Amino acid sequence: MESVRQQKVARLILKEMADIFLKESRVLFGNVFISITVVRMSPDLSVAKLYLSIMLQEDKNAILKEIKVHTKELRKLLGERIRKQVRIIPEIIFYLDDNVDYANHMDDVLSKITIPKKEDENFDPNQYPGLKE
């Protein structure tokens, strides 16, 4: 469980990095929409793990690699914004958050399931024992 301080610093980093990605991503990464879904801080506040959701792009891993190339530059921009609020600027580690893709996949799977209605002539109550009358 994260401490209150970890949560505060994580929220601060999320807010500032989201603003940095909003303003700088077009210059650095082209026409890609990058959002930060979660920030996790280490107990000593020296490492921030940022989970990114990358949209409008097919090859998300290529964009993630490009982001990792610019990690120093992004950390410098973050440091300029939060240096008076934290003692040390944390090391930034980026991860790809695939929860949105997984949710879309599960939505597709669930939409393909067809359960006949009780009024349907093909309905067999023995085939669906969990359904109540």
From Swiss-Prot:
Where it sits in the cell: the answer is: Cytoplasm
Question: Which InterPro entries does the UniProt record give?
Answer: KH_dom-like_a/b (IPR015946), RbfA (IPR000238), RbfA_dom_sf (IPR023799)
Q: Which residues form a coiled coil?
A: none
Does this entry carry the keyword Cytoplasm?
A: yes
Q: Where does it mainly reside?
A: cytoplasm
Asked if the keyword Cytoplasm belongs to this entry, the reply reads yes
Annotated GO CC locations: cytosol
Keywords recorded for this protein, A-Z: Cytoplasm, Ribosome biogenesis
Q: Name one GO molecular function term.
A: ribosomal small subunit binding
- Gene Ontology BP term (one): maturation of SSU-rRNA
UniProt-listed HAMAP family:
RbfA
Biological role: One of several proteins that assist in the late maturation steps of the functional core of the 30S ribosomal subunit. Associates with free 30S ribosomal subunits (but not with 30S subunits that are part of 70S ribosomes or polysomes). Required for efficient processing of 16S rRNA. May interact with the 5'-terminal helix region of 16S rRNA.
The record describes its quaternary structure and partners as: Monomer. Binds 30S ribosomal subunits, but not 50S ribosomal subunits or 70S ribosomes.
Hey, which family's this protein in? Belongs to the RbfA family.
The protein here is known as Ribosome-binding factor A
Q: Which organism is it from?
A: Cytophaga hutchinsonii (strain ATCC 33406 / DSM 1761 / CIP 103989 / NBRC 15051 / NCIMB 9469 / D465)
